[in-house]
Amino acid sequence: MKRTYQPSRIKRKRTHGFLARKRTSTGRNVLRRRRAKGRERLTV
């Protein structure tokens, strides 16, 4: 059986990357929350 996780750097960046987060209002909320929490890495 094929595994569900098939890593791809492009897909990873496009869906979870900084620019992807920045693009939507909810994504910007995610960045805001992570900054408030003091996360070292905001995105992938």
UniProtKB/Swiss-Prot annotation:
GO terms for cellular component: ribonucleoprotein complex; ribosome. The keyword Glycosyltransferase does not apply. It comes from the Bacteria. Residues 1-44 are annotated as: Disordered. One of its GO terms (molecular function) is structural constituent of ribosome. Residues 1-38 have a biased composition (Basic residues). Gene3D superfamilies: 1.10.287.3980. PROSITE patterns: RIBOSOMAL_L34 (PS00784). Keywords: Ribonucleoprotein, Ribosomal protein. It holds the Pfam family Ribosomal_L34. InterPro entries: Ribosomal_bL34, Ribosomal_bL34_CS. One of its GO terms (biological process) is translation. Belongs to the bacterial ribosomal protein bL34 family. This is Large ribosomal subunit protein bL34. It comes from Petrotoga mobilis (strain DSM 10674 / SJ95).
